[in-house]
Amino acid sequence: PGTPPVVLDRGYDLKEAAKMTVTAVGSDNGILCDGDNLLLYPQEEEEKFFQALKDEGVVLFEEKGDVEKFGAVLFHDGHPVPELVGKDAPVIAKAAGFDIPKGTKVMGLKIDAVGKANVLNKEIMGPIVVLKGYESFEEAVAMAIQNMEEAGGIGHTAGIFSNDRKHIEYYGERIPVARVL
């Protein structure tokens, strides 16, 4: 499975990252396995980054109970529910018990753990980006690797939003994928 983790590095343009995320996840309803599945962002930038996502039309769900409802409808016994694969964001939201604007292209779900601790870290195949904050860049890389080891995606794709060549190299040398975008 392709569950691409993407690290948003400190200092990268938050608005540009939000715009590119919507393009990656929303253009094909998350069917292609090369979009941002898990997006790791600097914790201290959460408010600004979430606003940038909202400005791009992303509907965010931050409350744990709300997010858990998506996990319950998207997966059954740990496997994707075929009826929701590739569906539009409002259709998936409705299945989880929420009404969102009809033209919504992407939803964001804030999680508190990576890997097997949350079923939403698996391949979703829908217009959803899963969001998790990090304290240090090294922690973000470790979480990306853990997520791939536990939820799938080793050998597939990963991404990074960064202007720091050393961070890009650090990520590229450690993340177990065939390509880093």
Where are these regions (language model features)?
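ALDH superfamily catalytic-core signature
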Residues: 1-115
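Conserved C-terminal structural/oligomerization subdomain of aldehyde/semialdehyde dehydrogenase
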Residues: 98-181
